[in-house]
A protein has these predicted regions:
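Pyridoxal 5′-phosphate
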Residues: 1-369
Length: 369
């Protein structure tokens, strides 16, 4: 049986999600239609919105459904930038490409970016943030910082970031895709203006996500059309997708700490945990293996029916040195030697032991390639 340790790329549909999703797919009616079929679909959509809001810790009107995390991040960053009419964006080079590429696109449109310093464990330098806010808050359009890094699992102290930003009235967006459900992420208590989340990292369907937008936050929309989703995101809404997302969000994740402890214990003799002793979520672990190509190791493990990754899967299937590890100060060689393992509800201690059993030969072979 294949061992799947790449849940941070996508996590298989959970049984309860699949059951609810297939039932909801039989709905007839556009949620924007005023006839009874349309209103039935609207009722299902709004019930799902309310349930998702409860799981996120926000008001139902703050949930803006999107096609996933990438769209949600783009809507937040481009929407805040356009609405505020200021030039400076504050972010870090360790962000997901959905954030980095959106920010770099805005640079071509006249934005200026302050790239925050990042520690060797992948945590932003709060002194650097305090300094740039003090000196340039009047120019700042937004701050964009992920809550949990999708490659290393390192946690950003978001409440500290928002407390600092609030002094200067600068909105904070967070990519919450890797944090939601894997650590306490209550939007209402976070101080965030916007947060991106997605269903398929939680055992929901691919192609469905949300941007959580606080009531006080105004955005310029990316899409124009029928004015759905508080006029922030036009397009016919997918009621069945919303139901599936709500069920995935309501279904708790297992406690992965025992799996993480075993993985660190068994893999550390061969590789180095990239986040070191920095606090991180237990379901994402990244290791570097000196003298190895991570790509070679990935293929060798695949021959053992073990699926892992080099880092983010959102680089169009192209294996390359991790931009996250490069930003953390790793050499090109070290950043190319990384493997990420990530857990889901089906992951067992036996899976971790099987990985650890296969690794010594895989590492030895990879060093010869």
């Amino acid at each position: 049986v294949p061992i799947y340790l790449d849940h941070a790329a996508t996590s298989p549909l959970r049984p309860e999600v699949l059951a609810a999703y297939t039932e909801a797919l039989q709905l007839v009616g556009n949620p924007s239609s005023i006839h009874s079929a349309g209103q039935s679909a609207r009722a299902v959509l709004e019930d799902a919105r309310e349930r998702l809001a409860a799981a996120v810790g926000c008001d139902r009107n703050e949930v803006i459904f999107t096609s996933g995390g990438t769209e949600a991040n783009n809507l937040a960053i481009k929407g805040l930038y356009a609405h505020r009419g200021r030039k400076l964006i504050i972010t870090a080079a360790t962000e997901h490409h959905a954030v980095l590429d959106a920010v770099e696109y805005l640079e071509t449109q006249g934005a200026e970016v302050h790239w925050l310093s990042v520690s060797s464990a992948g945590v932003i330098d709060m002194d650097d943030l305090a300094r740039v806010l003090e000196e340039r808050h009047e120019e700042a359009a937004l701050i964009a910082l992920m809550w949990v890094n999708n490659e290393t699992g390192a946690i950003t102290p978001i409440e500290q970031v928002t407390a600092l930003a609030a002094k200067y009235g600068v909105p904070v967006h967070s990519d919450g895709v890797a944090s939601f459900q894997h650590m306490p992420t209550n939007f209402g208590d976070s101080g965030l203006s916007t947060m991106a989340i997605t269903a398929h990292k939680l055992g929901g369907p691919v192609g469905f996500g949300a941007l959580i937008v606080s009531r006080a936050t105004e955005l310029t929309p990316l899409f124009h059309g029928g004015g759905q989703e508080r006029a922030l995101r036009a397009g016919t809404m997918d009621a069945a997708g919303a139901v599936a997302f709500a069920v995935a969000a309501e279904t708790p994740q297992p406690d992965y700490r025992e799996l993480a402890a075993l993985a660190v214990e068994l893999i550390s003799p061969l590789g180095t945990l990239t986040r070191g002793s920095t606090p991180g979520v237990p379901n994402i672990l990244s290791f570097t293996f000196e003298g190895c190509s991570g790509e070679s190791m990935l293929f060798l493990l695949d021959e053992h029916d073990i699926a892992v990754s080099n880092g983010s899967a959102c680089t169009a299937g192209v294996a390359r040195a991790s931009h996250v590890l490069l930003a953390m100060g790793h050499t090109q060689e070290s950043a190319s030697s990384a493997l990420r393992i990530s857990f889901g509800p089906q992951t067992s201690l036996e899976d971790i032991k099987a990985l650890a059993e296969a690794l010594p030969n895989v590492v030895a072979t990879a060093r010869k390639i």
